[in-house]
Design a protein with these regions (language model features):
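Basic/aromatic recognition patch in beta-strand/loop cores that engages polyanionic ligands
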Residues: 49-81
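Enriched for short, Lys/Arg-rich terminal
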Residues: 69, 73-103
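Arg/Lys-rich, positively charged N-terminal/basic patches that mediate binding to nucleic acids
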Residues: 1-36
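Short proline/glycine- and basic residue-enriched helix-capping loop/turn segments at helix->loop/beta transitions
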Residues: 45
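Hydrophobic alpha-helical segments of small multi-pass membrane proteins
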Residues: 36-39, 65
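Solvent-exposed interaction patches of small proteins and small membrane subunits
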Residues: 25, 29-32, 36, 52-56, ...
Length: 103
């Protein structure tokens, strides 16, 4: 059975925010960044445990994983059964303590 990728509303909102931010500089660049984030997430269909266990989110009831895309963004996700839930796209330039309080 193929793994499904499910984007949470929060992750989709963040994706929109990233696009809007970069669009002010260049719509072409914004599109490229969002497309890379989206296509990177698709690799999780084949390799759902490809990301590292996210140490800043240790202690939550689910095992959050992450991997870096586009130098400054982490896809934060967890695997449950045949589904990968992308819960956030985290800008790694932010204060890491904020990540612990997002869920």
């Amino acid at each position: 059975m193929e793994t499904s990728i499910i984007w949470t509303n929060r992750a989709l909102d963040t994706l929109d925010d990233i696009f809007e931010f970069y669009k002010e500089k260049s719509e072409n660049a914004a599109t490229k960044i969002v497309n890379r984030l989206y296509h990177s997430a698709k690799t999780l269909k084949t390799f759902p445990n490809a990301g590292v266990i996210e140490p800043l989110l240790d202690g939550f009831p689910v095992c959050f994983r992450s991997f870096v895309v586009e130098k400054h963004f982490k896809l934060i996700y967890y695997v449950e059964g045949d589904c990968v839930y992308i819960t956030e796209i985290w800008d790694t330039r932010q204060d890491p303590d904020r990540l612990m309080h997002y869920s």
